Design a protein with these regions (language model features):
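Active-site mouth of glycoside hydrolases
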Residues: 1-174, 179-180, 188-190
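Short, conserved catalytic or adaptor-binding loops enriched in Gly and charged residues
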Residues: 163, 238, 290
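Long, contiguous hydrophobic alpha-helical segments, chiefly transmembrane helices and signal peptides
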Residues: 9, 14-20, 44-49, 147-151, ...
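Amphipathic alpha-helical segments in well-structured domains
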Residues: 30, 66-73, 131, 184, ...
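Aromatic-rich peripheral "rim/lid" segments of glycoside hydrolase catalytic domains that contact
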Residues: 241, 248-331
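Alpha-solenoid helical-repeat scaffolds
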Residues: 63, 121, 211, 308-311
Length: 331
């Protein structure tokens, strides 16, 4: 299936994809990375969640946990560092949301003994110091590919600036609707590293109208991408620190709303999972729930198959981005 996707991506002007994690099938993944690069000129950013989505929750204060995760990451780097298609490594995703207990809270004796107001910063110090250890080790075995810190918004990056200086790029996950707001200059003021938007986007389902809305998705993605250009090193009037971004996402994920029930994976669920008022086309939906995890693709998926693979259905956003990227590459 990656050959089908790779061809469509190449035709649209995609130059890099993000893989959130490695695979146990090393040869299969190497072939996919190689095919994307050799056939379509598309590079790969390969990541590791650093145990964030494991069960039980991650335990970044535990030496055994840290050693196991570090070993996994370094094995990944050793395995894939010589693949021509590799562009860089991404460490973590939105792990900083665990510091306050918002997502996947973890036990930390040092933090638990401290004042409540200091606990999150102590966890941040422990986590970012751990990421820095890994980044240093990666640079020793692979000096050719940058290391990216994956972080939810700007949260705790003032702590990262002190304890994680060896990362090369700050990767931001952000969902703020039409504009990224202060993200570019905000990063400059607290952690002056190049910025990469490692996850952003807009879904294509209008929860208020209860219908697919390609116009809505295309509107937000166009505005977002224009801000990326404005704040790149090539522009004159922006922050000049943005390297680019990874749109979330290429194709819809039908399994995501109820991932524990495999029978539901064949159903394209339209129930929104969370709320973000900045996506204002449908923020008046019931309970303001307007973010639909199964509808973020710029390419839809059909139940019909062609050569054993579900047909890809490009949305308006796909063609809008194709036109925008073609215009940019010609300048």
């Amino acid at each position: 299936p990656w050959l089908i996707d790779g061809k469509m991506m190449s035709e649209a002007g995609v130059n890099t994809i993000r893989l959130y994690k490695s695979s146990d099938n090393h040869n299969g993944l190497k072939k996919a990375i190689g095919d994307f690069y050799e056939k379509y000129g598309i590079r790969t950013a390969l990541g590791h969640w650093l145990g964030f989505w494991e069960y039980p929750q991650p335990f970044y204060a535990d030496p055994e946990f840290r050693e196991r995760i570090k070993k996994e990451v370094l094995e990944m780097v050793k395995t894939y560092k010589d693949e021509k298609g590799i562009l860089f490594w991404i460490l973590g995703n939105e792990n900083n949301y665990s510091f306050s207990g918002r997502v996947n809270p973890w036990v930390c004796p040092e933090a638990d003994k401290a004042e409540v107001s200091e606990q999150a910063n102590i966890r941040a110090k422990i986590y970012y110091s751990f990421v820095n250890e890994i980044a240093r080790e990666i640079h020793k075995i692979d000096p050719n590919h940058p290391v990216v810190l994956g972080n939810g918004e700007l949260g705790y990056l003032d702590v990262a600036a002190k304890f994680c200086p060896d990362i090369d790029i700050v990767g931001i996950l952000i969902y703020r609707g039409k504009t990224f707001g202060n993200i570019f200059n905000g990063l400059k003021s607290i952690f002056d590293k190049p910025l990469l938007l490692v996850e952003f986007g807009a879904d294509s389902y209008n929860s208020f109208k209860k219908a697919e809305d390609e116009e809505m998705q295309s509107f937000f993605l166009e505005a977002q991408w224009k801000e990326i250009y404005k704040n790149s090193g090539f522009a004159k009037d922006g922050a000049g620190n943005c390297l680019g971004g990874f749109i979330f996402e290429w194709s819809d994920e039908w399994w995501k709303h109820n991932s524990d029930n495999s029978l539901n994976w064949k159903v394209h669920d339209t129930e929104a999972g969370w709320s973000q008022g900045a996506y204002y086309f449908d923020n008046k939906a019931e309970k303001n729930l307007n973010m639909n995890e199964e509808w973020f693709g710029i390419v839809g998926i059909s139940e019909d198959k062609e050569n054993g693979v579900n047909k890809r259905l490009p949305r308006k956003a796909y063609y809008m981005l194709k036109k925008m990227w073609e215009s940019s590459s010609s300048k």
